[in-house]
């Protein structure tokens, strides 16, 4: 079962998932993806992870309801992180993975590794483009 915490925005609360008990729980989340799932893998002892935290928190807090945000500590979710490493999907932390609606496997649609502010900005802009590309498909489904 996924565990989460609430972050307080000025007018709304955003749920951020902070733990998966198993890889199976992660796949269940992807199966119920309403638009995008964004997963940051990091650790409390990781300097670059600490540097990107304010940027990541800001993005998570301002993300729309069809974006599921996950901030996962690799020392607490060893099963998931070990699996990502064994499949060569991650090679260090921090890493942020993006999953679009319909992607129900472990391989992300987009990702970024590291704490470069310019590259982070580019990644979050790509997240916005992915959301815009989903908007017509979501509104057509909602009309049915």
Regions flagged by a language model, labelled:
Residues 1-28:
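N-terminal "domain-start" segment that seeds a small globular fold
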Residues 17-22, 41, 53-81:
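Thiol-based oxidoreductase modules, predominantly thioredoxin-like and allied folds used
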Residues 25-26, 79-80, 119:
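Short acidic active-site motifs
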Residues 32-43:
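Short active-site neighborhood of thiol/selenol oxidoreductases, capturing the structured segment around
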Residues 46-49, 96:
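The canonical Cys-X-X-Cys-His
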Residues 79-92:
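Mid-chain, well-packed structural core segment of small domains
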Residues 91-92, 97-142:
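Non-catalytic, surface beta->alpha helical segment in thiol-disulfide oxidoreductase systems
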